[in-house]
């Protein structure tokens, strides 16, 4: 009789343990219901990039003095700077400037060390093409500013998690609680 009683007790303990595991997993599932979805519907929804995002490089031809600092600080010597020395004014004259984004590692050294700030990072990250030679941008295509994701009315913008935290902190700071 005792072995049968022990069998029922073991069965009861196993049932309670199984119910506890099911309850724990159900609680984990319920904790995920208030979270926002991780994925977005990409062509129609775009995530807002952070302030320090390193996208395509923007180049301003008129500011460049052809000093080639960007070439020297680039880990892969990527920017191609063509210039001619004007002997009458003893200055370099920039003829052509190009960057191949198929090779660029987007480190940002060229932007950081440029003495005239003619280079800047944009928020453009859609650089995919069918031909890799289209990724070689000259001074004309580098000079075009991309349309801002926020300014495009056909696309729904979605804030990422850090931007949502910043927005929540700002809204909490702006409220004042008074007791009457």
UniProtKB/Swiss-Prot annotation:
SUPFAM superfamilies: 4Fe-4S ferredoxins. Binds 2 [4Fe-4S] clusters per subunit. Its main location: plastid. It is a peripheral membrane protein. It is found in: Plastid, Chloroplast thylakoid membrane. The keyword Cytoplasm does not apply. [4Fe-4S] cluster 1 binds at residues 64, 67, 70, 114. It is an enzyme of class 7 (translocase). It holds the Pfam family Fer4_7. Belongs to the complex I 23 kDa subunit family. NDH is composed of at least 16 different subunits, 5 of which are encoded in the nucleus. This is NAD(P)H-quinone oxidoreductase subunit I, chloroplastic. It comes from Illicium oligandrum (Star anise).
